C-alpha cells in the first residue's frame, strides 16, 4: 500500500515539476523569446561604401548610442520621413541592403527612410530588458528625427513590423505622426505567450516580463491606420492582428493576405503598392489641410484689409464734410 502511494505521488509530482521547470525556463528566457539580437557585418560594410545611405548615431537621453541607417531624399532640403521599426530577428543593415538590392527602396522616393537597431542589434549596445526600454527606444528616435533640418517635422510617419508594431503604435499615440502602418501586428505580449504555452491565465500571467500592450496605446492614435495581416502567418496569429484593429478609432484599411508566411510580407508587391499609396495619401491630405488653412488665413487678411480701407475712406469723407 505504501509503495502504491509513493508511486501515486510520483505520478502527481512529476508532471507538476516538469511544468514548473518549463515555466522557470520560459520566464528566465523571455528576452530571447521576444528579441533575437543579431548583426550583419557584410551588409554593414556594403552600405558603408554606398553614398546613398548614411550611418546614423543617435545619443539618447540616458547617454547611450543607437545606431542605424538613413536613406535621405536628396531632392529636397526637407522631406517627409518614415521611421521603420523592425521585426525581432532583423537588423538595420540587412533590411536596408535588402531594400536596396531588390529595388524596393524606390517605394520611398521623395521620403527619408530611417531604420535604427534595437539594443543588442547591429552596433547598438545593451539589450531590451523591459517594456520601458523598448518604448523609449521609439520616442528617442522620433525626437531625434524631429530636430533634423532635412526632416519635415509636420510629416513624420511610422511603420512597424511584427515585434516592432508595439513601438510604432506607442510612438503614434504619444507623438504627432502623419501616418501609421502596421505589418503582422499583435494586440499584446500575453497573446504571444499563450500562443506558445497556453498557461498564462489568472495569477500566472503576472509572471510575464513583457506586456507590449499595443492595444492599450491604439485608442490614442489619431491618424488612420493601415494594417496588413495574413491568415497563413505562423508567428503572429491572424486573430491577434484582427483584435488589435478593433482598438483603433480610425482604420484606413485592414488588408487580409492569403497564403503569406511571416517572413514574406515584404516580398509582395501588393503590400508595397498599398504602403506607397497610403504614404502619399497621408502627405497629400496634410498638404490639403495646410492649403485650406492658408486659404482661410489669406481670406481673413483680405477681408480685414478691405475693412480697414473702407474705414479709412469713410474717415476721409467725414473729415471733408466737417471742413
Predicted features, each with a name:
Residues 97-98, 214, 223, 237-246:
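Short alpha-helix in the alpha/beta-hydrolase fold that links the catalytic acid
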Residues 242, 246-289, 300-302:
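C-terminal catalytic histidine-bearing segment of alpha/beta-hydrolase fold enzymes
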Residues 61, 65-144:
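Membrane-embedded segments
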Residues 165-220, 264-267:
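Hydrolase active-site cap/lid region
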Residues 151-161:
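Alpha/beta-hydrolase fold nucleophile elbow
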Residues 232-236, 263:
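Acidic catalytic loop of the alpha/beta-hydrolase fold
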Residues 221-222, 226-229, 233:
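Short beta-strand/loop motif that positions the catalytic acidic residue
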Residues 15-59:
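An N-terminal hydrophobic leader/cap segment in hydrolases
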Amino acid at each position: 500500500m505504501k509503495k502504491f502511494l509513493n508511486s501515486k505521488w510520483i505520478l502527481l509530482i512529476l508532471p507538476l515539476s516538469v511544468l514548473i521547470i518549463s515555466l522557470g525556463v520560459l520566464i528566465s528566457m523571455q528576452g530571447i523569446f521576444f528579441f533575437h539580437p543579431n548583426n550583419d557585418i557584410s551588409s554593414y560594410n556594403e552600405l558603408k561604401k554606398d553614398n546613398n545611405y548614411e550611418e546614423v548615431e543617435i545619443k539618447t537621453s540616458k547617454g547611450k548610442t543607437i545606431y542605424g541607417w538613413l536613406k535621405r531624399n536628396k531632392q529636397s532640403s526637407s522631406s517627409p520621413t518614415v521611421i521603420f521599426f523592425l521585426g525581432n530577428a532583423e537588423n538595420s543593415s540587412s533590411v536596408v541592403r535588402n531594400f536596396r538590392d531588390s529595388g524596393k527602396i524606390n517605394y520611398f522616393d521623395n521620403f527619408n527612410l530611417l531604420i535604427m537597431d534595437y539594443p543588442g542589434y547591429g552596433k547598438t549596445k545593451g539589450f531590451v530588458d523591459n517594456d520601458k526600454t523598448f518604448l523609449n527606444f521609439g520616442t528617442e528616435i522620433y525626437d531625434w528625427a524631429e530636430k533634423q533640418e532635412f526632416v519635415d517635422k509636420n510629416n513624420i510617419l511610422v511603420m512597424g513590423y511584427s515585434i516592432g508594431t508595439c513601438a510604432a503604435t506607442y510612438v503614434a499615440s504619444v507623438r504627432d505622426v502623419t501616418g501609421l502602418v502596421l505589418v503582422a501586428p499583435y494586440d499584446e505580449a500575453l497573446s504571444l505567450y499563450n500562443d506558445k504555452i497556453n498557461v498564462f491565465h489568472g495569477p500566472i500571467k503576472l509572471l510575464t516580463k513583457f506586456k507590449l500592450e499595443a492595444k492599450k496605446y491604439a485608442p490614442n492614435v489619431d491618424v488612420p491606420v493601415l494594417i496588413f495581416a495574413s491568415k497563413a502567418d505562423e508567428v503572429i496569429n491572424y486573430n491577434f492582428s484582427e483584435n488589435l484593429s478593433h482598438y483603433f478609432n480610425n482604420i484606413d484599411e485592414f488588408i487580409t493576405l492569403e497564403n503569406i508566411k511571416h517572413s514574406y510580407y515584404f516580398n509582395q508587391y501588393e503590400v508595397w503598392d498599398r504602403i506607397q499609396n497610403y504614404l502619399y495619401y497621408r502627405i497629400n491630405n496634410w498638404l490639403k489641410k495646410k492649403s485650406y488653412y492658408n486659404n482661410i488665413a489669406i481670406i481673413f487678411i483680405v477681408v480685414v484689409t478691405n475693412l480697414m480701407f473702407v474705414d479709412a475712406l469713410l474717415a476721409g469723407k467725414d473729415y471733408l464734410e466737417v471742413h
